A protein has these predicted regions:
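Acidic-enriched and Gly/Ser
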Residues: 2-154, 158-186
Length: 186
């Protein structure tokens, strides 16, 4: 069991039978009364974010989640992964994969989280390299600073890129924000 003094960002706990992960926390010690910890927690199954306050000394149940490294194989409505430790294939519904589908490429290694034997989500690398398949030519001269244009990458995701990026270029995208980071060297 965890105590409120153990609360940290990334801590996984169980509330009302569902696994939650702590996104933010703040310890508050008022002048009068008992201390408490104010948290922002995210449900790992449905993604709902809650604000929850825990009194000092309150006990929290740890979430028995398991993270396994898996390789993305293909998608046919569902997403299919291979567990390299036992060569077992696992299918995830698109609702579990969510926005991560914008960045998945064949043979990509990711972490899949399981809770009570059921897959509840996946963790992508912070950055992925994707090929630009479609973009308009950048027009020079009619910009002041920081101009960008939309580009479609190999997964079908559309991202804003600087004018110098052309079709066929490899670009790095931050999977946490969905934004262009840099053009990769050829």
């Amino acid at each position: 069991m965890y105590e409120t003094s153990d609360i940290r960002k990334g801590l996984r706990i169980v509330l009302d039978g569902d696994p939650f992960v702590v996104m933010e926390f703040q310890f508050v010690k008022p002048g009068k009364g008992t201390a408490f910890t104010r948290t922002k927690i995210r449900n790992m199954i449905n993604g709902a974010v809650l604000d929850r306050t825990f009194k000092s000394g309150e006990k929290l149940k740890p979430a028995d989640t398991e993270d396994r490294e898996m390789q993305f194989l293909y998608s046919d409505g569902d997403f299919h992964f291979l567990d390299n430790s036992n060569y077992e294939q696992v299918s995830l519904e698109s609702s579990v994969v969510g926005d991560a589908s914008n960045y998945l490429t064949e043979n990509m290694m990711i972490e899949v989280s399981f809770f009570q034997g059921r897959s509840i989500g996946l963790t992508l690398p912070n950055f992925v390299a994707l090929k630009v398949t479609e973009t308009t030519p950048g027009e020079k001269g009619n910009t002041v600073t920081g101009a960008s244009k939309p580009a479609v990458v190999s997964t079908g995701y559309t991202v804003n890129v600087p004018l110098f990026v052309n079709e066929g270029d490899q670009i790095r995208i931050d999977t946490r924000t969905g934004e262009y980071v840099e053009r990769e060297k050829a």
